[in-house]
Amino acid sequence: LTTLLLADSGQATVMGMDVVKDFWQIRKKVGYMPGRFSLYQDLTVQENLDFFATIFNTSIKENYHLIKDIYSQIEPFKDRRAGKLSGGMKQKLALSCALIHSPSVLFLDEPTTGVDAVSRKEFWEMLKNLKAKGITILVSTPYMDEATQCDRIALIQNGKILSVDTPEGMMADYPDKLYAVSSKS
């Protein structure tokens, strides 16, 4: 969906655009934050932000209104190398870089995995603020408590959508624990 890898089968659209035919247009309109920290660890916080702004032909100043709340928390560390940041600070930097070009849709792949409880809570507060600014946010998460903060949940297994509903509807449909079982044979 982020068009970083182009699909070789099936069909998908983002904002009504085909993920294969329209991938350049989609890339300009989506932000993506991978599950594993993937920014340049040898660059400083400021250098990472400047780099991503340049890639998207924008500037921090131009879209500061979007990242202000997040950036204000990492600005004291702007001269620190990204690899030396704490887990929570790395996530804030990655989110700022994903937002630097003012995307309409934000894809977050397990954004709080391996982050402490306080940072997780802060991160979800930031997402609520971004949602209030009109950004559509898609989050993959293994944490049901995080999923319940979303407007809608999709259960996906092996690339197939099993169910889509509100958190309340999903819990009503699956009142018992869900388990994923796989075997090697």
What feature does the model see in each segment?
Residues 61-84:
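Conserved ABC nucleotide-binding domain
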Residues 106-109:
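Catalytic Walker B motif of ABC-type/P-loop ATPase nucleotide-binding domains
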Residues 164-165:
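ABC ATPase "signature
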Residues 95:
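Hydrophobic anchor residue at the start of the ABC signature
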Residues 10-18, 26:
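Conserved ABC transporter NBD signature motif
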